[in-house]
């Protein structure tokens, strides 16, 4: 434990106030990302940043999930001389598990992507990309209750693209089937603290195409085709 003695470790939402901890208790604080800086209103982002600084001030150890996030921490947080320890996210082995074919699968060859349907994921870029691959379908899967999801649906309708399907949330077994049977995994996300889906896709030996942004070059580590420019001409 490198002289830390007994250390208290529990999952704490990085934006919430620090829970009351017994005096003298050492604890580890893990920072996952700084998405709030671009996703929240300025006053709220400042509040979250103050809360994060308060936790760092009191933490015995600060950890994070990628060297990319570690660099962002150094830009926005006074570490008080503390070291940041990078501990990559653990990834469950799912490639040996059974999958279930989703009811929406058409039987045609397909590409796959997954994640919350939020603007930072850049799923709208894939609509135009798929116009260049009429012989393939694309399944965009994930929590679609965000306003951006409706923008993607509208774009699909406006451009009359018939081979892109925004499916909403899927089960674990459906996800496994899609990873196992897709022709390639596409991940044009603009901001990731880690990027778990690209690692999951690699478990199945799939070709991964990902944005050369934030943590993704680090996590893909030369095992993916990286999109340098996020425009249709460059991505196809």
What does each model-found stretch correspond to?
Residues 1-236:
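Carbohydrate transferase catalytic cores enriched for Leloir-type hexosyltransferases
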């Amino acid at each position: 434990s490198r002289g830390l003695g007994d250390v208290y470790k529990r999952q704490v939402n990085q934006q919430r106030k620090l829970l009351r901890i017994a005096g003298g208790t050492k604890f580890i604080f893990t920072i996952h990302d700084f998405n709030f800086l671009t996703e929240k209103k300025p006053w709220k982002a400042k509040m979250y940043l103050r809360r994060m600084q308060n936790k760092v001030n009191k933490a015995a150890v600060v950890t994070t999930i990628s060297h990319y996030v570690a660099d962002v921490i150094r830009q926005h947080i006074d570490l008080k001389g503390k070291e940041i320890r990078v501990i990559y996210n653990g990834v469950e082995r799912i490639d040996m598990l059974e999958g279930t074919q989703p009811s929406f699968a058409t039987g045609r060859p397909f590409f796959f992507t997954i994640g919350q349907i939020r603007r930072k994921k850049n799923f709208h870029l894939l609509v135009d990309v798929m116009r260049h691959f009429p012989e393939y379908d694309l399944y965009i899967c994930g929590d679609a209750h965000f306003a951006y999801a409706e923008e993607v649906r509208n774009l699909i309708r406006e451009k009359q693209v018939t081979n892109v399907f925004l499916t909403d949330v899927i089960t674990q077994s459906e996800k496994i089937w899609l990873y196992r049977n897709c022709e390639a995994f596409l991940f044009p996300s603009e901001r990731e603290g880690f990027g778990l889906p690209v690692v999951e896709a690699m478990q199945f030996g799939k070709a991964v195409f990902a944005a050369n942004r934030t943590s993704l070059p680090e996590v893909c580590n030369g095992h993916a085709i990286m999109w340098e420019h996020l425009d249709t001409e460059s991505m196809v």
